[in-house]
């Protein structure tokens, strides 16, 4: 009987200890604190995203690592400065800043342009109505647009206007839309963006588009204040369009603007005499255009690649601090992809577009390095947030326990020296050792709580991951 009574008392005591222990834990740390720490630990395993950071997509794990279906190791070929890689602009949508979209034919720009007007989380979303080609993208509280693109302002500087046309046209166009009072304000910021595509598949896509009757005759090709003459820019076909042309016919025309289109549209044509081919040799002309296109691409606020939709979305969001509503999707079922092209034909297309091939390799390298740089920057920020949460938790625990983590000794007046017995001296020495051990344990705990503070971040190139 006594045994059962003792057992009952012990069980009741244990239950009371557990009950009061739970109350103490809830008092020390609120539920949100523990959730934050748990989520921080979990996010570090899923790509070092801090609590509250939104994953770009609903998939588990890293949504970027294998979007293109290949897990090859990316090795940077070009050396870029931190200024080239760091892309985070202070875009004031409520101010006067404008995003200008340079739309190159057959690069997926139509899809991206629709994302800009229909898929961005905004305080004042663009107003798009069925049957209308353009959307109204006004700033909050103003009747002033923040976006210059096909689907917002239309082809206001010409059909598929290039870099040369846009940089000379957009500022004056925006000023003409404003009142006289607003024209006196300081000049606004124009953030140019574009999308590039693999040159071979872009070229095939343009051929198929022209084969179906597209001409782009409305393009102005304005340069240095004038239009090109027919001698400078002759046509590849005599009729109204080039519908039904074969790939061979498309390739043999020496005046075909599809050749190296991306390089030409991103370069400053004024540097080479616009479309006057007699100013310099062809190789010298294209070499200058390539360097100009590379320079403009580096200085653009943002550019994306059709082959990397999710990374394109991520870099745009990272650059402008804007978020898309729905994730981008990688669609490979284009008309160009359905064309069966012999290896020899592909080689000829690459030769015809050798400057675009060089530009795309350069752009791809810069794009992936920017992505890697942004991801590591995001991880550093998430790590700092975890450190701050850990410090807050430590401070709350110490505040409740009423300790500082370190022993504090106050000087006291020593008593007169008296002869001490060996036993008393030995006991005093043991007390001193226990005090030192306790202080050391407190310092170890302090160091453990701040172990992340002393870590050194390796250069991002030394830790290149499997991105492509």
Curated annotation (Swiss-Prot):
Residue positions with a glycan: 79, 276, 332
First and last residue of the signal peptide: none
Claim: Cell membrane is one of the keywords in the record: no
Membrane-spanning parts: 10-30
InterPro entries: Heparan_SO4-6-sulfoTrfase, P-loop_NTPase, Sulfotransferase
GO MF terms held by the record: heparan sulfate 6-sulfotransferase activity
EC number: 2.8.2.-
Segments of skewed composition (Acidic residues): 438-447
Protein's UniProt keywords contain Kinase: no
Subcellular localization(s) per the UniProt record: Membrane
Membrane side Lumenal: residue ranges: 31-468
Enzyme class: transferase
UniProt: substrate binding residues: 133-134, 150, 155, 160, 209, 216
Superkingdom to which the source organism belongs: Eukaryota
Catalytic site: 160
Broad class of where this protein is predominantly found: membrane
Record family assignment: Belongs to the sulfotransferase 6 family.
Function noted in UniProt: 6-O-sulfation enzyme which catalyzes the transfer of sulfate from 3'-phosphoadenosine 5'-phosphosulfate (PAPS) to position 6 of the N-sulfoglucosamine residue (GlcNS) of heparan sulfate. Required for muscle development and angiogenesis.
Name assigned to this protein: Heparan-sulfate 6-O-sulfotransferase 2
Organism of this sequence: Danio rerio
Gene name per UniProt: hs6st2
């Amino acid at each position: 009987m006594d045994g059962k009574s003792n057992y009952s008392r012990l069980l009741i005591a244990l239950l009371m200890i557990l009950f009061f222990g739970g109350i103490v834990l809830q008092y020390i740390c609120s539920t949100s604190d523990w959730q934050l720490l748990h989520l921080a630990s979990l996010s570090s395993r899923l790509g070092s995203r801090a609590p509250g950071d939104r994953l770009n997509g609903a998939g588990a794990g890293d949504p970027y690592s294998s979007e293109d279906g290949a897990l090859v190791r990316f090795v940077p070929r070009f050396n870029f400065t931190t200024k080239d890689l760091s892309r985070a602009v202070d875009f004031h949508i409520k101010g006067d800043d404008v995003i200008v979209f340079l739309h190159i034919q057959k690069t997926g720009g139509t899809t991206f342009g629709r994302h800009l007007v229909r898929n961005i989380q905004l305080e004042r979303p663009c107003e798009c109505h069925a049957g209308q080609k353009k959307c109204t993208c006004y700033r909050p509280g103003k009747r002033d647009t923040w976006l210059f693109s096909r689907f917002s302002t239309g082809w206001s500087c010409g059909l598929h206007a290039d870099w040369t046309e846009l940089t000379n046209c957009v500022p004056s166009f925006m000023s003409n839309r404003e009142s006289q009072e607003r024209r006196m304000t300081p000049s606004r910021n124009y953030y140019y963006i574009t999308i590039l595509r693999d040159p071979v598949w872009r070229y095939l896509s343009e051929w198929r588009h022209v084969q179906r009757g597209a001409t782009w005759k409305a393009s102005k090709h304005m340069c240095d204040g004038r239009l090109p003459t027919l001698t400078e820019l002759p046509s590849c076909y005599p009729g109204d369009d080039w519908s039904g042309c074969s790939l061979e016919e498309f390739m043999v025309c020496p005046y075909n603007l599809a050749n190296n289109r991306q390089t030409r549209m991103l370069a400053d044509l004024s540097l080479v005499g616009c479309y006057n081919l007699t100013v310099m040799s062809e190789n010298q002309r294209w070499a200058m255009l390539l360097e100009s296109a590379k320079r403009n691409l580096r200085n653009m606020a943002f550019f994306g690649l059709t082959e990397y939709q999710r990374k394109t979305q991520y870099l745009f969001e990272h650059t402008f601090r804007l978020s898309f509503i729905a994730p981008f999707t990688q669609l490979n079922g284009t008309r160009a992809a359905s064309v069966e092209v012999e290896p020899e034909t592909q080689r000829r297309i690459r030769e015809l577009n050798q400057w675009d091939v060089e530009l795309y390799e350069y752009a791809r390298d810069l794009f992936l390095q920017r992505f890697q740089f942004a991801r590591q920057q995001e991880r550093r920020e998430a790590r700092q947030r975890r450190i701050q949460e850990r410090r807050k938790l430590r401070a709350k625990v110490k505040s409740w326990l009423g300790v500082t983590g370190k022993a504090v000794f106050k000087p006291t007046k020593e008593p007169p020296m008296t002869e001490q017995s060996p036993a008393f001296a030995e006991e005093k020495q043991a007390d001193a050792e226990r005090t030192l051990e306790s202080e050391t344990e407190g310092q170890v705990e302090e160091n453990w709580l701040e172990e992340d503070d002393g870590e050194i971040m390796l250069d991002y190139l030394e830790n290149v991951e499997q991105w492509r």
